[in-house]
C-alpha cells in the first residue's frame, strides 16, 4: 500500500508540474498586470508573492533544519498531494457526471432551505433556458477561454469608483468552477482557486459540459438548484418546455436567487427578464450560440 502511494505521488507530482506550468503560461499570456487599473488586487498579489518568497527562502536556508518544521512540512506535503489528487480525479469525473453534492447545496441544507434538485441531461434542457442564461450571464461564452478580460477591466474600474456597489465579471465557466469545486463568498484565496479551476475545466471539458453542469447546479431560488427543479417549482413544467419569457425570468434571478424571486415575481426579475428576452432575440442569429444550444 505504501509503495502504491509513493508511485501515485510521483505520477501526480509530474502531473502537477505540467498542470501548473500550463496554468502559469496561460495566465502570463492572458493577463498583463499593467493592463489593469491600480487596485487593491495588485497590492494583494504583490503581498502574497512577497510572503511566499520570504517563507520559501527562510525554509530553505533556516527553518528546514528544525525538526518541528521538518515534520510540519512533511504533513503539509501529504495534505497537499491528497487535496490535489482528489480535486484532479473530481475534475476528470466531472467530464461524465454531475457532482453528487456541492458545498453550496450542503450549505442550503444546513441553513434550513432544503435541497430541491433534479439533474437532467443536456438534451432534456431545451434551447430556451440555455439561450436565456447565455444572454443573461455570458454572451461571449461560446467563444472565450473562460475569462472575459474586457469585462474584468470594466468591473475593476467601476468597483474602484463605487466601492459600495460591487460589480462582478464572472463568466459561466467561472461560476461553474465556484459552484462545483468551491464555495460562495469572496476572498483572495477563493478567487485564486476559482481562476485555477476555471482554467482547468476550460482545458478538459467541452462547452456543452460546462453549460450542462451550470444549468444543473446553479441555485435558482432558496434551496432550488438546477433548471429542472426551477421549472417544476415556478411553472409546473419540464425545463425543455419553458417559453422564452419563463426561461428569462429564471435567468434573471441568478445574480442573487434568494433576493430576486421568480414566484412571487420581484420587480427586479420582471424588469430584467424583459431585457433578457430582447438579448435572446439578438443572439438568435449568432451561429456559435445556436450551435451550442441545439
Enumerate the predicted regions with their spans.
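Juxtamembrane regions of bacterial inner-membrane/periplasmic proteins
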Residues: 2-294
Amino acid at each position: 500500500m505504501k509503495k502504491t502511494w509513493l508511485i501515485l505521488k510521483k505520477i501526480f507530482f509530474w502531473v502537477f508540474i505540467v498542470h501548473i506550468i500550463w496554468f502559469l503560461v496561460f495566465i502570463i499570456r492572458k493577463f498583463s498586470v499593467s493592463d489593469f487599473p491600480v487596485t487593491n488586487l495588485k497590492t494583494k498579489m504583490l503581498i502574497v508573492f512577497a510572503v511566499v518568497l520570504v517563507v520559501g527562502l527562510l525554509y530553505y536556508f533556516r527553518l528546514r533544519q528544525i525538526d518541528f518544521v521538518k515534520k510540519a512540512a512533511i504533513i503539509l506535503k501529504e495534505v497537499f498531494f491528497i487535496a490535489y489528487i482528489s480535486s484532479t480525479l473530481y475534475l476528470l469525473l466531472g467530464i461524465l457526471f454531475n457532482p453528487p453534492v456541492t458545498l453550496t447545496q450542503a450549505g442550503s441544507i444546513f441553513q434550513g432551505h432544503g435541497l430541491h434538485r433534479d439533474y437532467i441531461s443536456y438534451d432534456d434542457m431545451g434551447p430556451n433556458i440555455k439561450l436565456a442564461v447565455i444572454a443573461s450571464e455570458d454572451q461571449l461564452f461560446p467563444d472565450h477561454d473562460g475569462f472575459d478580460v474586457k469585462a474584468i477591466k470594466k468591473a475593476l474600474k467601476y468597483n474602484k469608483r463605487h466601492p459600495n456597489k460591487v460589480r462582478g465579471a464572472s463568466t459561466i465557466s467561472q461560476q461553474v468552477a465556484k459552484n462545483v469545486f468551491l464555495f460562495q463568498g469572496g476572498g483572495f484565496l477563493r478567487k485564486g482557486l476559482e481562476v485555477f479551476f476555471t482554467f482547468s475545466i476550460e482545458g478538459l471539458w467541452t462547452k456543452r459540459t460546462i453549460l450542462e453542469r451550470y444549468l444543473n447546479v446553479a441555485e435558482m431560488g432558496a434551496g432550488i438548484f438546477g433548471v429542472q427543479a426551477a421549472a417544476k417549482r415556478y411553472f409546473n413544467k419540464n425545463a425543455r418546455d419553458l417559453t422564452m419569457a419563463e426561461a428569462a425570468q429564471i435567468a434573471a434571478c441568478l445574480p442573487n436567487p434568494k433576493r430576486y424571486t421568480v414566484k412571487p415575481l420581484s420587480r427586479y426579475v420582471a424588469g430584467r427578464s424583459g431585457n433578457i428576452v430582447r438579448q435572446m432575440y439578438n443572439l438568435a442569429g449568432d451561429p456559435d450560440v445556436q450551435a451550442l444550444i441545439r
